[in-house]
Amino acid sequence: MEITASLVKELRERTGVGMMECKKALSENAGNIDAAVEWLRKSGLVKADKKAGRIAAEGRIVVVHDGGKAVLVEINSETDFVAKDSHFLAFAEAVAQAALVAGAVDVEALKSVKLPSGETVEEARAAVIAKIGENVRVRRLARIDSANNVAAYVHGGRIGVLVEVKGGDVELARGIAMHVAAMNPPYNKVADVSAEFLEKEKEIELSKMSEKDKSKPADILEKIISGKINKIVKEVTLYGQPYVLNADQSVEQVVKAAGADVIGFQRMEVGEGIEKIVEDYASEVMKQVGLS
């Protein structure tokens, strides 16, 4: 497969590695981007694939919370310009409120829910599109209904979190929600980390070791690898991370000191996993006034 400049550019954006190293990684892996990322990780040139954290689409995250009930909704627009439009914002808030009241559990069920205007969510979406001249999509919905402490947190309309905590108090739950928003842990506790993830990380750590280290006795080698994996597990679990409101303690220590337990959490960030053609602000304005 031909290694094109666009492939090299994409790999560089995902990893932050130099162009020559990216070209070599692609050549070694027949132009396969994902395989090239892993090859670079095994070579010790990059710690992680940055693509997963790149936000591509626009829109808004809306959170609505009432006691033990809370919903988290992502509404997408094509541009940031429209994401700040009053019609778009009113629609997003109305959809989230309706989702909470109706008990909707997914986007498909939400489409037929009626808003205070008498329109269904889908009908209102079509009306908003007609007003603003841009596609609008209700992309994701998450909810919690529980007798436990439930907290909701939204940051700048772009990141939203729901957290369920058994025991403790609402303030603890809110602090945990803020932590999840800031640190984005993939897993809750050690028990939640997948065997596939652990095996892959073990393979990567082994690949990065020197031949001298690899030649050590099996029990010593296992201790070295286990130490590295344990460190990684702390980084990717909520319980293992230093608490953002008190970095001297881990989240697990803070939660246990309160006699509590984090049952689970939901986190959304605008545009996760969606690619977007980059346009400058002037282009967005021109598009809105019909001059492009």
Swiss-Prot record:
Compartments annotated for it: namely: Cytoplasm
- What are the protein's GO molecular function terms? translation elongation factor activity
Keywords carried by this UniProt record: Cytoplasm, Elongation factor, Protein biosynthesis
Q: Which Pfam families does the record cross-reference, listed alphabetically?
A: EF_TS
Please tell me one Gene Ontology term that the record gives under cellular component. Answer: cytoplasm
Q: Where is this region: Involved in Mg(2+) ion dislocation from EF-Tu?
A: 79-82
Q: Which family does it belong to?
A: Belongs to the EF-Ts family.
Which HAMAP family does the annotation name? EF_Ts (MF_00050)
Stated role: Associates with the EF-Tu.GDP complex and induces the exchange of GDP to GTP. It remains bound to the aminoacyl-tRNA.EF-Tu.GTP complex up to the GTP hydrolysis stage on the ribosome.
| Protein name from the UniProt record | Elongation factor Ts
Organism in which the protein naturally occurs: Xylella fastidiosa (strain 9a5c)
